[in-house]
Amino acid sequence: ASSIESHGTVILGAIPSNSLRNQFDMKFGLIEQGDNPRKFLKKFSGIQTNLKILDNSAKGIGSMSIGDNDSIIRRLPLFENINGSLVPSLSLETLRVAIGASTFQIKSSNASGETAFGEETGINHVKLGNLIIPTNEDGSAWIHYTNDPIKTIPIWKILDKEFSEEFFEGKILIVGTSAPGLFDL
Protein backbone atom coordinates (compact mmCIF):
# COMPACT_ATOMS: atom_id res chain seq x y z
CA ALA A 1 0.00 0.00 0.00
CA SER A 2 2.81 2.41 0.81
CA SER A 3 4.51 1.70 -2.54
CA ILE A 4 1.23 2.37 -4.38
CA GLU A 5 0.73 5.64 -2.54
CA SER A 6 4.33 6.84 -2.86
CA HIS A 7 4.34 6.23 -6.62
CA GLY A 8 1.40 8.60 -6.96
CA THR A 9 -0.02 7.39 -10.28
CA VAL A 10 -1.24 3.84 -9.62
CA ILE A 11 -4.76 3.01 -10.83
CA LEU A 12 -6.53 -0.12 -9.59
CA GLY A 13 -9.38 -2.00 -11.20
CA ALA A 14 -12.71 -3.04 -9.73
CA ILE A 15 -15.25 -5.45 -11.19
CA PRO A 16 -18.95 -4.50 -11.45
CA SER A 17 -21.18 -7.05 -9.75
CA ASN A 18 -24.82 -7.61 -8.99
CA SER A 19 -24.02 -9.61 -5.86
CA LEU A 20 -21.28 -7.64 -4.09
CA ARG A 21 -21.87 -4.18 -2.65
CA ASN A 22 -18.40 -2.96 -1.72
CA GLN A 23 -17.88 0.78 -1.51
CA PHE A 24 -14.88 2.98 -2.25
CA ASP A 25 -14.22 6.69 -2.40
CA MET A 26 -14.20 8.27 -5.84
CA LYS A 27 -11.00 10.15 -6.57
CA PHE A 28 -12.31 12.55 -9.21
CA GLY A 29 -14.72 15.40 -9.71
CA LEU A 30 -17.78 14.96 -11.89
CA ILE A 31 -19.90 17.48 -13.77
CA GLU A 32 -23.16 16.22 -15.26
CA GLN A 33 -24.93 18.32 -17.89
CA GLY A 34 -28.29 17.55 -19.43
CA ASP A 35 -30.35 14.45 -18.78
CA ASN A 36 -29.30 12.13 -15.96
CA PRO A 37 -26.62 9.86 -17.48
CA ARG A 38 -27.51 7.02 -15.08
CA LYS A 39 -30.58 6.28 -17.23
CA PHE A 40 -28.39 5.38 -20.20
CA LEU A 41 -25.59 3.40 -18.51
CA LYS A 42 -25.44 -0.28 -17.71
CA LYS A 43 -26.51 -0.65 -14.08
CA PHE A 44 -24.95 -2.84 -11.41
CA SER A 45 -25.98 -3.08 -7.78
CA GLY A 46 -22.41 -3.36 -6.50
CA ILE A 47 -18.73 -3.68 -7.29
CA GLN A 48 -15.94 -6.05 -6.30
CA THR A 49 -13.09 -3.92 -5.03
CA ASN A 50 -9.59 -4.54 -3.73
CA LEU A 51 -8.46 -4.50 -0.13
CA LYS A 52 -9.52 -1.13 1.31
CA ILE A 53 -5.92 -0.21 2.21
CA LEU A 54 -4.92 -0.66 -1.46
CA ASP A 55 -7.93 1.26 -2.83
CA ASN A 56 -7.23 4.13 -0.43
CA SER A 57 -3.58 4.26 -1.56
CA ALA A 58 -4.32 4.35 -5.30
CA LYS A 59 -4.63 7.57 -7.32
CA GLY A 60 -7.72 6.19 -9.03
CA ILE A 61 -10.02 3.19 -9.36
CA GLY A 62 -11.67 2.16 -12.61
CA SER A 63 -14.32 -0.32 -13.62
CA MET A 64 -13.19 -3.39 -15.53
CA SER A 65 -16.15 -4.21 -17.76
CA ILE A 66 -16.18 -5.10 -21.42
CA GLY A 67 -19.73 -4.37 -22.49
CA ASP A 68 -20.65 -6.49 -25.51
CA ASN A 69 -21.57 -10.10 -24.79
CA ASP A 70 -20.14 -11.70 -27.93
CA SER A 71 -16.48 -11.70 -26.76
CA ILE A 72 -15.51 -9.27 -29.51
CA ILE A 73 -14.52 -5.95 -28.01
CA ARG A 74 -15.62 -3.13 -30.31
CA ARG A 75 -16.82 -0.54 -27.81
CA LEU A 76 -15.88 0.29 -24.25
CA PRO A 77 -18.34 1.64 -21.68
CA LEU A 78 -16.71 4.82 -20.35
CA PHE A 79 -18.79 4.81 -17.15
CA GLU A 80 -20.86 2.28 -15.21
CA ASN A 81 -23.84 3.02 -12.98
CA ILE A 82 -22.89 1.28 -9.74
CA ASN A 83 -25.88 1.59 -7.41
CA GLY A 84 -26.37 5.21 -8.51
CA SER A 85 -22.67 6.16 -8.45
CA LEU A 86 -20.89 6.82 -11.73
CA VAL A 87 -17.64 4.84 -11.93
CA PRO A 88 -15.25 5.46 -14.86
CA SER A 89 -13.76 2.61 -16.86
CA LEU A 90 -10.22 1.58 -15.99
CA SER A 91 -9.08 3.04 -19.34
CA LEU A 92 -10.76 6.40 -18.76
CA GLU A 93 -9.50 6.64 -15.19
CA THR A 94 -5.97 5.79 -16.39
CA LEU A 95 -6.21 8.57 -18.97
CA ARG A 96 -7.44 11.03 -16.32
CA VAL A 97 -4.44 10.37 -14.10
CA ALA A 98 -1.99 10.31 -17.03
CA ILE A 99 -2.99 13.80 -18.22
CA GLY A 100 -3.32 15.20 -14.69
CA ALA A 101 -7.04 16.01 -14.94
CA SER A 102 -9.20 16.10 -11.84
CA THR A 103 -12.74 16.21 -13.25
CA PHE A 104 -14.88 14.37 -15.78
CA GLN A 105 -17.70 16.16 -17.58
CA ILE A 106 -20.56 14.07 -18.96
CA LYS A 107 -22.76 15.87 -21.47
CA SER A 108 -26.09 14.18 -22.19
CA SER A 109 -29.15 15.02 -24.24
CA ASN A 110 -30.85 18.32 -23.43
CA ALA A 111 -27.63 19.89 -22.13
CA SER A 112 -26.85 23.42 -23.27
CA GLY A 113 -25.77 23.34 -26.90
CA GLU A 114 -26.96 19.76 -27.49
CA THR A 115 -29.85 19.10 -29.85
CA ALA A 116 -32.39 16.59 -28.52
CA PHE A 117 -35.69 18.45 -28.99
CA GLY A 118 -36.79 17.49 -25.49
CA GLU A 119 -36.18 13.77 -26.04
CA GLU A 120 -33.87 11.80 -23.76
CA THR A 121 -31.54 10.46 -26.42
CA GLY A 122 -28.52 9.51 -24.31
CA ILE A 123 -24.99 10.55 -23.52
CA ASN A 124 -23.32 12.69 -26.21
CA HIS A 125 -19.73 12.91 -25.01
CA VAL A 126 -17.34 12.86 -22.09
CA LYS A 127 -14.87 15.69 -21.59
CA LEU A 128 -11.61 15.21 -19.75
CA GLY A 129 -9.27 18.19 -19.64
CA ASN A 130 -9.13 19.46 -23.25
CA LEU A 131 -10.07 16.04 -24.62
CA ILE A 132 -13.63 15.46 -25.85
CA ILE A 133 -14.58 11.81 -26.34
CA PRO A 134 -17.72 11.26 -28.46
CA THR A 135 -19.90 8.45 -27.17
CA ASN A 136 -22.81 6.31 -28.22
CA GLU A 137 -26.08 6.99 -26.40
CA ASP A 138 -25.16 4.39 -23.75
CA GLY A 139 -21.91 6.19 -22.89
CA SER A 140 -19.69 3.72 -24.72
CA ALA A 141 -16.93 4.71 -27.13
CA TRP A 142 -15.75 2.89 -30.22
CA ILE A 143 -12.25 1.48 -29.87
CA HIS A 144 -9.85 2.48 -32.61
CA TYR A 145 -7.21 -0.22 -32.71
CA THR A 146 -3.72 0.69 -33.82
CA ASN A 147 -1.63 -1.28 -36.30
CA ASP A 148 1.30 -1.20 -33.90
CA PRO A 149 1.28 -4.18 -31.55
CA ILE A 150 1.24 -3.53 -27.82
CA LYS A 151 4.65 -4.01 -26.27
CA THR A 152 4.52 -6.74 -23.63
CA ILE A 153 7.39 -7.47 -21.31
CA PRO A 154 7.54 -10.47 -18.98
CA ILE A 155 8.05 -9.57 -15.32
CA TRP A 156 11.28 -11.55 -15.12
CA LYS A 157 12.88 -9.14 -17.62
CA ILE A 158 11.79 -6.12 -15.59
CA LEU A 159 13.18 -7.63 -12.39
CA ASP A 160 16.56 -8.19 -14.07
CA LYS A 161 19.18 -5.73 -12.75
CA GLU A 162 20.16 -4.92 -16.35
CA PHE A 163 16.68 -3.58 -17.22
CA SER A 164 16.56 0.22 -17.47
CA GLU A 165 13.67 2.02 -15.77
CA GLU A 166 14.07 4.76 -18.40
CA PHE A 167 12.25 2.45 -20.83
CA PHE A 168 8.99 3.40 -19.07
CA GLU A 169 9.56 7.18 -19.02
CA GLY A 170 6.55 8.99 -20.49
CA LYS A 171 4.59 5.77 -20.96
CA ILE A 172 1.54 4.22 -19.35
CA LEU A 173 2.42 0.88 -17.81
CA ILE A 174 -0.33 -1.69 -17.31
CA VAL A 175 0.55 -4.59 -15.04
CA GLY A 176 -1.65 -7.65 -15.25
CA THR A 177 -1.83 -11.32 -15.91
CA SER A 178 -2.11 -13.22 -19.14
CA ALA A 179 -5.33 -14.98 -20.09
CA PRO A 180 -3.82 -18.43 -19.31
CA GLY A 181 -2.68 -17.02 -15.96
CA LEU A 182 -6.29 -16.30 -15.03
CA PHE A 183 -7.05 -20.01 -14.94
CA ASP A 184 -5.02 -20.24 -11.71
CA LEU A 185 -7.31 -17.81 -9.90
What are these regions (language model features)?
Residues 1-131, 164-185:
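Non-transmembrane functional regions of envelope-associated proteins
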Residues 127-165:
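Protease-associated
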